[in-house]
UniProtKB/Swiss-Prot annotation:
CDD domains: Obg. It comes from Wigglesworthia glossinidia brevipalpis. Belongs to the TRAFAC class OBG-HflX-like GTPase superfamily. OBG GTPase family. The gene is obg. This is GTPase Obg. GTP binds at residues 168-175, 193-197, 214-217, 282-285, 314-316. Its cofactor is Mg(2+).
């Protein structure tokens, strides 16, 4: 699925209901005392973390979240009903920012299921005239209005909690790999730039769930730094990174120089290069001399700083993919969060 990873929303708590001015009037009680009830409190706006919510698309569709106002007070000492709360469900791994004077001020971070954040408090109820009666004021004419609910502009920024992150140049087989192993079906072709958004997918292998995230190419398409960083952030929580490449057997140095740009970018973003990274050499079925190809692959891996952490796969040969998945599963078992 395409990943909507940020949204700006407006939240507002409901206004408090106003108090009522009323006096008891019955057949044999022409001058009864005050019986104006209080208003209801305005509803609150909450953010809940939800394990079944996977992105922020719903916050792009509905940008305004306004809680219900409290009802006004009524006669016969009847209080108005409180306004209903509004609940915004977000994925686990969402940062919550209040936007004030064009600055993003961190408010909270969702870390587990059903975590709650009160982001806009409803207004306090108004008081009816019955509240103000006293021995010296038996017919109060005063009441109060309900308070206004809080209102804020909020930025939501979601960082996916994946186990394995995929990166590399376009047309290196990342999308094909994701489709072959998981429940995600990204757009695939023999042309570059088909991965334009982060993709998330999951694989159940030997009764173990593995979550993958595939991010677009760092360089191609002339991505600006802020957009590139928006993609790179989804690798932050990964325990393992897979660097997909196509090895040019006719010009190994060209491959190395090209891939060093990816590594430079990776090093520039919050120490991502310190994470375990495996080099995945794709499309090995098109190479004829396997011995020469292996030596070239080893040379490329060493030159990029991966040493012996490289694997060959062919998307036309599921056995090679199954071997890689077994290796990944073993690594994740040995390196639990």
């Amino acid at each position: 699925m395409n990943l909507t990873d940020n949204a700006v929303i407006f939240v507002k708590g409901g206004n408090g209901g106003k108090g009522c001015v009323s006096f008891r009037r019955e057949k044999y009680i022409p001058k009864g005392g005050p019986d104006g009830g209080n208003g209801g409190n305005g509803g609150n706006v909450w953010i809940y973390s939800d394990k079944n919510t996977h992105d922020l698309y719903h916050c792009l569709v509905r940008k305004n979240f306004i809680a219900e106002d409290g009802e006004n007070g009524k006669k016969n000492n009847s209080s108005g009903k409180n306004g209903k709360d509004v609940i915004i469900k977000v994925p686990i791994g969402t940062n919550i920012f209040f936007i004030k004077n064009s600055e993003n001020i961190i408010f909270g971070h969702t870390r587990f299921h059903n975590q709650k954040f009160l982001v806009a408090k409803g207004g306090v109820r108004g008081l009816g005239n019955n509240y103000f009666k006293s021995p010296t004021n038996r017919t109060p004419m005063e009441s109060t209005l309900g308070k206004l609910g809080e209102s804020f502009k909020i930025k939501l920024d979601f960082v996916f909690l994946a186990d394995v992150g995929l990166f590399g140049y376009s047309n290196t087989g990342r999308s094909c790999f994701m489709r072959s192993i998981s429940n995600v079906k990204p757009k695939i072709s023999f042309y570059p730039f088909t991965t334009l958004f982060p993709y998330i997918g999951s694989l159940n292998f030997l009764n173990k769930d593995i979550k993958f995230v595939d991010i677009p190419s760092f360089i191609e398409g002339k991505k600006k730094n802020n957009l590139r960083n928006r993609f790179l952030k989804h690798l932050q929580n990964c325990r393992l990174l897979l660097h997909f490449i196509n090895l040019d057997v006719k010009n190994v140095k060209k491959t190395i120089n090209k891939e060093k740009i990816n590594i430079k970018i990776l090093k520039s973003f919050r120490n991502l290069f310190l994470k375990p990274i495996w080099l995945i050499i794709n499309k090995t079925d098109i190479n004829i001399n396997s011995n020469i190809f292996f030596k070239q692959a080893q040379f490329v891996s060493n030159s990029l700083g991966y040493e012996k952490k490289f694997f060959f796969i062919s998307l036309n040969d599921f056995i090679s993919i199954k071997i890689l998945i077994n290796k990944i599963l073993l690594f994740l078992e040995e390196n639990k969060r």
